[in-house]
């Protein structure tokens, strides 16, 4: 029974919209971050009185009927997926979506029905949800051929990368830099060639991450080195050494503080005994009867 008044309201809104003039306000690309919030701004002419606002995405999302003379607006969220996830910001009732998921990507539109001019405006948004990228992972495929020549391919990837990813490689020599587009880098080496290092860079519209530099010398010297995932090993080794150094500094600091306390305690006790002795000597002795 509670749903019947809302159903009647929607039917009346649809019937009234058939006699209106329509005005298209364009489409807007909106970049959003996974598990964060986004607001879809809605522009309403200041001299117009709004009859209602209908938000939709794939299907009806919510209907907003502004209140009159200080009364609150009537808001009905019609899509269960957005219950507790959306709110509407005064004074234009822009749509605010919190805790974004991949499913929230896609087209959204706002239909604003104006009471005074009998005109309906339509504004569209395309939400693209992305996530912050983690450190790139490198896969190495190593092959050796005759006459001491070697070839190697490096494949760069990011876990749960999502859409619109781009990859590039930076090859660095003694005094040269070379850029390569794409996630796969193929290279070769012959005796006498100078050693290079390779860095993968991964990008999406909201973040930019790079791998640790990978030297090619260990690969050509030892083909089994390719199975050790050097970029991850180097990064873990550097982080481990840094943590170990911090722990050593912390332990030395605690030891110094403890030694200082040990030296201070006998002095404090001796000082307290001297004070007590002086106080006793300062008191007048009892005279004999």
From Swiss-Prot:
Signal peptide positions (record): 1-18
Keyword ATP-binding found: no
Extracellular membrane side: 19-236
Gene Ontology cellular component list: cell surface; external side of plasma membrane
Annotated S-S bridges: 156-200
Domain Ig-like V-type residue range list: 27-114
The protein's role, per its UniProt record: May play a role in the immune response.
PANTHER family in UniProt: SIGNALING LYMPHOCYTIC ACTIVATION MOLECULE, SLAM FAMILY MEMBER 9
Listed name of the protein: SLAM family member 9
Originating organism: Homo sapiens
Gene: SLAMF9
């Amino acid at each position: 029974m509670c749903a019947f008044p809302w159903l009647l309201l929607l039917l009346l809104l649809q019937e009234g919209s058939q006699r209106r003039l329509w005005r298209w306000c364009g489409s807007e690309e909106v970049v959003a971050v996974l598990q964060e919030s986004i607001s879809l701004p809605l522009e309403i002419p200041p001299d117009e009185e709004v009859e209602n606002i209908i938000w939709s995405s794939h299907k009806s999302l919510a209907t907003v009927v502004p209140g009159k003379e200080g009364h609150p607006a009537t808001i009905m969220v019609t899509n269960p997926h957005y219950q507790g996830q959306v709110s509407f910001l005064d004074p234009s009732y822009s749509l605010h979506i919190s805790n974004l998921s991949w499913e929230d990507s896609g087209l959204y539109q706002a239909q604003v029905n104006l009471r005074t001019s009998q005109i309906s405006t339509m504004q569209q948004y395309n939400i693209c949800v992305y996530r912050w990228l983690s450190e790139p992972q490198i896969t190495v495929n190593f092959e050796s051929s005759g006459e001491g020549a070697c070839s190697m391919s490096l494949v760069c990837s990011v876990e749960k990368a999502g859409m619109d990813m781009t990859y590039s490689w930076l090859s660095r020599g003694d005094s040269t830099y070379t850029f390569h587009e794409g996630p796969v880098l193929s290279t070769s080496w012959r005796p006498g060639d100078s050693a290079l290092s390779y860095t993968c860079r991964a990008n999406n519209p909201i973040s930019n991450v790079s791998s640790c530099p990978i030297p090619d010398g260990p690969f050509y010297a030892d083909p089994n080195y390719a199975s050790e995932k050097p970029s991850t090993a180097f990064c873990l080794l550097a982080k481990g050494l840094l943590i170990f150094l911090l722990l050593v500094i912390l332990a030395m600091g605690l030891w110094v503080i403890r030694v200082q306390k040990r030296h201070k305690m006998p002095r404090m006790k001796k000082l307290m005994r001297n004070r007590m002795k002086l106080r006793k000597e300062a008191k007048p002795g009892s005279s004999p009867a």
